[in-house]
Amino acid sequence: MEINHDYRVKLFDELSFERKQCTECNQWFWTLDKDRTTCGDSPCDEYSFIGSPITSKKYTYNEMVKEFTNFFAEKGHSPVKRSPVVAKRWRDDILLTIASIAVFQPWVTNGLVKPVKNPLVIAQPCIRLNDIDNVGRTGRHLTCFTMGAHHAFNSKDEYKYWTDKTVEYCFELMQRLGIDGKTITFIESWWEGGGNAGPCYEVITHGVELATLVFMQYKKVGNDYEEIPLKIVDTGYGIERFAWASQGTPTVYESLFSEIIEKLKEDAGIPEVDEKIMAESATLAGLMDIENVGDLRVLRQKVAEKIGMDVDELDKLISPLEYIYAIADHTRCLSFMFGDGIVPSNVKEGYLARLVLRKTLRYMEKIGISMSIKDIIAMQLENMKEIYPELSEMKEYVMDVLDAEEKKYIQTVNRGRGIVERMAASKSEITLDDLIELYDSNGLPPEIVKDVVDELNKKGKKTIAITVPDNFYTIVAERHEEEKPEEVVSTKKELPELEVSETELLFFKHPTQAEFEAKILKIAEKYVVLDKTLFYAEGGGQKYDIGQLNDIEVSDVQKKNGIVFHKVSDISKFKEGDTVKGTLNWENRLKLMRNHTATHVINAAATRVLGKHIWQTGSNVDTEKGRLDITHYERISREQVKEIERIANEMVLSKMPVNSTFMDRNDAEQKYGFTIYQGGVVPGDTLRIIEIEETDVEACGGTHCSNTSEVGYIKVLKTERIQDGVERLEYSTGMGSVSEIAIIEDTLIDSAEILGIPNDQLPKTVKRFFEEWKEQKKTIEELQKKVGELVKYELADKFEKVGDYEVLVEQVSGTPNELMSIADNLAVGNKLIVLMNESDYLLCKRGENVELSMKELIRNIGKGGGKDNLAQGKYSETKEQITEKISQILNK
């Protein structure tokens, strides 16, 4: 469709704004200044607010949040609480909250759900890591920023306001702050994102963009656009930039973190830097319109030329301060990440949090900051307490996770040297892909890799090339920032597409009913489709119900597009239009109800024991057992498991009602928060809420008991770490728990009988045996070492000269450990050892002067693998044949 948007609004006519074209960038803009020739934005105009605040008073960040919110509240907008910075809490396509409109996507923006208020105002903290390497260096970039926004959602039934009022509000707010109207320009522009599009204004003053006013009204379809029924006012005001411009500080960081910056400078012993230098750097950065770190070296050169200083001296002077700026920004970002419950890991949002944390720790090391990162983040939490008290409520978790992650980082760095040395041994260059692999797989920052390689180059026989891109962290963050949908292999894909009405689910209204009658709408292959059913279809982690239709077994139940498919053992017994009688296997259903209710109970208990940060990442409810996967930053201890189990059973004994209600999505979110999505994102404007009174509330479509007492005894059977940052709890309920306890008891009794001791003596006896075994193992290892030394002399005369190396190929009696001990004694210098035992075990080991890879050698003479200096496997040929093959390889 052809789009001809008129950017003229009522305010422009009333105040006699003029439309002009920028002489520098050719963009069209509106201004009150009849003499203006440029659009006002950088790089067409330089920052003119540094050292010269543009508002009638100076605003702190907290004051600016309040001023912005109060202004729009006075204009009839309902203030809405911020959402978490973890967008995964309510949507599954992005990990972090990157804009205020993300809070209302996809349900509100696509018209499925009404907005919680209309119009509304929100000050939404956002995180974007696509500029993380620019932070601290340009004077304006932040990883964590607050997008002030007023949104209006206009439909044919409910119209609020559009372009005229939006521009009027913006201009009035800026004048209320004391900004001269003649300095404000409205640049005509176009916005696209998330499949939507619309015209917009970029609102500029004194060289800096303070707001963007978007009018979302189109859907992008290929290269064309379609008008959408919901017209959305989507504005974004940079709260931090408003505060910066009101204070006129050299960089945005002083306006936000002045107290923290001063403490860090004092701690690191960094001398004062002339504010004019930092102001010049920030101003020139604006003129250069820096969007990639490659331009930063050019920026440094330009600043040096402008102030008449050598570029290396300038770099030495301001780099430490730039690190401090970055630390201040990153610790605020981490305060939101951890305060909103992110658990560090090697995937998804946990990966991004760990990236920011380790980058911060590296910078702290680099400039010698002695205070802990916990101290810095404690200051951040205190500073934000007035606006975001909920972050301080999570302080205990934040401090605990920082402790755990700092220890992991130190361990990573300590083992990093060996990892890098092994990689460098077989390479002439450490590439960007190598650096990313070392970071992703081993957590090694590129700076540490470079330090190790530089040391190797100084004392090594060869030179290994390495270049660390200035934007390394941006590159790795962008690879992980977007959520990629996981491929799920499901039986639902095999189900046919049908044009019948959705199946009425009777178990919501009649949770204890076991029999029903229904009409057959369709016979689809091996499935029967009914107009209504009591059978629960597999979903939400819960297994399907089983039972009968007209005495014919129902062995599987699936759902697709709201239609329930019943798999029966004899499809020939059914025909469309017939009425059938359905009967559930009630014992099976009861077990599923108990185990599903137990999932909620254990989740609530785990939250009390481990903390509010835990988040359900998956569950599986079967008849015999259930399992729950939750985020947590360390292994769950035995004592914590016992406490979780105790609290869970206390809830069972307390006979707590389990209530099921259907609620409007907005009402549920406002009442309970985003924790209702613990079980996963639920579509639609109406949610089924399961509430265990004052304990656990979740949006859930499964079958549950009506009271916790019906669950029976809960036994946590085991926990395991299924991936970094995720713990799995496996449990049983009722008679299942009795059976599991009996198995454990039998194991203990059998073990005690084998040892011929009473049950209560088992732990002490096992401990004694274990200590004795360790002593014997130590003695055996010492004997093996002595045997190896003796065999060394026996084999010393059996080496043969092959090419440049002394080669030993020998069959030796002994275990793999004994052969390893022998090889350790012999593999020195230019010696190459190949040992075999009578069990087909094969060992290849080389001395430090042998360049041939043992991993490659073993593949040529047998089967196996290993490293360049040591390989193990199996052999099938004779000693003579293996010797001949080695000679051929070495004499090539």
Swiss-Prot record:
Its main location: cytoplasm. It comes from the Archaea. InterPro entries: aa-tRNA-synth_II/BPL/LPL, Ala-tRNA-lgiase_IIc, Ala-tRNA-ligase_IIc_anticod-bd, Ala-tRNA-synth_IIc_core, Ala-tRNA-synth_IIc_N, Ala-tRNA_lgiase_arc, Ala-tRNA_ligase, Thr/Ala-tRNA-synth_IIc_edit. PROSITE patterns: AA_TRNA_LIGASE_II_ALA. The keyword ATP-binding applies. Its cofactor is Zn(2+). It is an enzyme of class 6 (ligase). Binds 1 zinc ion per subunit. It is found in: Cytoplasm. One of its GO terms (biological process) is alanyl-tRNA aminoacylation. Zn(2+) binds at residues 596, 600, 700, 704. It catalyses: tRNA(Ala) + L-alanine + ATP = L-alanyl-tRNA(Ala) + AMP + diphosphate. GO terms for cellular component: cytoplasm. Keywords: Aminoacyl-tRNA synthetase, ATP-binding, Cytoplasm, Ligase, Metal-binding, Nucleotide-binding, Protein biosynthesis, RNA-binding, tRNA-binding, Zinc. GO terms for molecular function: alanine-tRNA ligase activity; aminoacyl-tRNA deacylase activity; ATP binding; tRNA binding; zinc ion binding. The keyword Magnesium does not apply. SMART domains: tRNA_SAD. Coiled coil: none annotated. Its EC number is 6.1.1.7. NCBIfam families: A-tRNA_syn_arch (TIGR03683), alaS (TIGR00344). Catalyzes the attachment of alanine to tRNA(Ala) in a two-step reaction: alanine is first activated by ATP to form Ala-AMP and then transferred to the acceptor end of tRNA(Ala). Also edits incorrectly charged Ser-tRNA(Ala) and Gly-tRNA(Ala) via its editing domain. Belongs to the class-II aminoacyl-tRNA synthetase family. Consists of three domains; the N-terminal catalytic domain, the editing domain and the C-terminal C-Ala domain. The editing domain removes incorrectly charged amino acids, while the C-Ala domain, along with tRNA(Ala), serves as a bridge to cooperatively bring together the editing and aminoacylation centers thus stimulating deacylation of misacylated tRNAs. This is Alanine--tRNA ligase. It comes from Methanococcus maripaludis (strain C6 / ATCC BAA-1332). The gene is alaS.
